[in-house]
Amino acid sequence: MRMAEEYGKGVPMVLNPQMGAIDATVESIRYRAQLIARNQKLDSGVMSTGIIGFAAGFLFSLLMVIILPLMAGL
């Protein structure tokens, strides 16, 4: 049995794997993870300021519907 060195080829090299599909999948996962993170940040911001926004809107509506017409003499 002859060795690889006898044929002048040396140690066989490992072929480079096809990384195109793997890279595309990794980028897709990374993009989706960023979208989910942004959405969670937005949701938490809205939820934390929801009561304050509701109260401000309610007071503004009272001002526009009740107080301003009374001041105008309607």
Curated annotation (Swiss-Prot):
Keyword terms, alphabetized: Cell membrane, Membrane, Methanogenesis, Methyltransferase, One-carbon metabolism, Transferase, Translocase, Transmembrane, Transmembrane helix
GO molecular function: tetrahydromethanopterin S-methyltransferase activity
Reactions that this protein is recorded to catalyse: 5-methyl-5,6,7,8-tetrahydromethanopterin + coenzyme M + 2 Na(+)(in) = 5,6,7,8-tetrahydromethanopterin + methyl-coenzyme M + 2 Na(+)(out)
InterPro entries from the UniProt entry: MeTrfase_F (IPR011307), MeTrfase_F_su (IPR013347)
Disulfide bonds: none
Purpose of the protein: Part of a complex that catalyzes the formation of methyl-coenzyme M and tetrahydromethanopterin from coenzyme M and methyl-tetrahydromethanopterin. This is an energy-conserving, sodium-ion translocating step.
Oligomer and partners: The complex is composed of 8 subunits; MtrA, MtrB, MtrC, MtrD, MtrE, MtrF, MtrG and MtrH.
Designated name of the protein: Tetrahydromethanopterin S-methyltransferase subunit F
